[in-house]
């Protein structure tokens, strides 16, 4: 029954998606989604699935080698989004219980095994308010938000991906995968918030990244580099951090469960540029 959501089959990122509340809106939504999907991906194919009200976006990271070994490395939550595109990602999710983590991880591994998957990858789920979860899609690649998983597991996912491609076996057993601490990633986008968050290309004339214990920056930015109009505006800079205070960080194990987060560390980033950056709305 309704509501349902129409989605492009050839891509994501919020493109080619339309929520349909009733049968009266279905034809128009299909036409709009197809048109947008064709423009974005060169493929107008769409599909329809259940629309989950106010869901959490939770994804399970996996590694699968050529010898039939598959591991999951816990979850990332990517629920804070704008225009169906991720803004903040964290690991682990405060909404996922150990039992849910085990069940979702086991299902992710089973799904990868059914299709003989080999590589690093991510199984994405939607989680409703009752703790039910629904398969959404699989990303057959390393994702932008992979560093938060690296921060809490201590495992270099890109290195493992290269080892898998070289035909080597995974070096870990499932019971060796543990989550320590809490990591949050924030994307700084090349968008202009004063112009409806339109892409804002230009030259970065000066750039100074934040640093310190628990801070990691993944970026190609440098003073003098150009953010091209052809670049993805949402992939300019990623900043991950694993502490909210020295005492919390040094304790080694903690959980974040709050409505407000102090983003002081992000205030240390300095930009002098002809293009604008934003953390979201």
Model-inferred region functions:
Residues 8, 13, 20-240, 253, ...:
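ATP-dependent carboxylate activation and anion-phosphoryl transfer catalytic cores
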Residues 257-261:
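Low-complexity, glycine/proline/serine-enriched flexible coil segments
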């Amino acid at each position: 029954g309704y509501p349902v959501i129409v989605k492009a089959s050839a891509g994501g990122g919020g493109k080619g998606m339309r929520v349909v509340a009733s049968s009266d809106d279905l034809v128009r939504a299909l036409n709009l989604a197809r048109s947008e999907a064709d423009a974005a991906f060169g493929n107008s194919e769409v599909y329809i699935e259940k629309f989950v009200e106010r869901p959490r976006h939770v994804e399970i990271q996996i590694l699968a080698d050529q010898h039939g070994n598959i591991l999951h490395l816990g979850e990332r939550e990517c629920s804070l989004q704008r225009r169906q595109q991720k803004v903040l990602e964290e690991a682990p999710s405060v909404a996922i219980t150990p039992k849910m983590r085990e069940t979702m991880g086991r299902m992710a591994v089973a799904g990868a095994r059914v299709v003989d998957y080999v590589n690093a990858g991510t199984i994405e789920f939607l989680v409703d308010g009752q703790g039910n979860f629904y398969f959404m899609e699989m990303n057959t690649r390393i994702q932008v938000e992979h560093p938060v998983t690296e921060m809490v597991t201590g495992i270099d996912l890109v290195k493992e991906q290269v080892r898998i491609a070289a035909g080597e076996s995974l070096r870990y057993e499932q019971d060796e995968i543990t989550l320590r601490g809490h990591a949050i990633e924030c994307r700084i986008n090349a968008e202009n918030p004063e112009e409806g968050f339109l892409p804002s290309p230009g030259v970065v004339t000066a750039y100074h990244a934040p640093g310190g214990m628990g801070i990691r920056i993944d970026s190609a930015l440098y003073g003098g580099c150009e953010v091209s109009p052809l670049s993805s505006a949402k992939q300019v800079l990623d900043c991950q951090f694993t502490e909210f205070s020295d005492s919390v960080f040094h304790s080694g194990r903690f959980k974040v469960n709050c409505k407000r987060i102090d983003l002081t560390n992000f205030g240390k980033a300095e930009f002098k540029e002809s293009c604008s950056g934003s953390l979201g709305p």
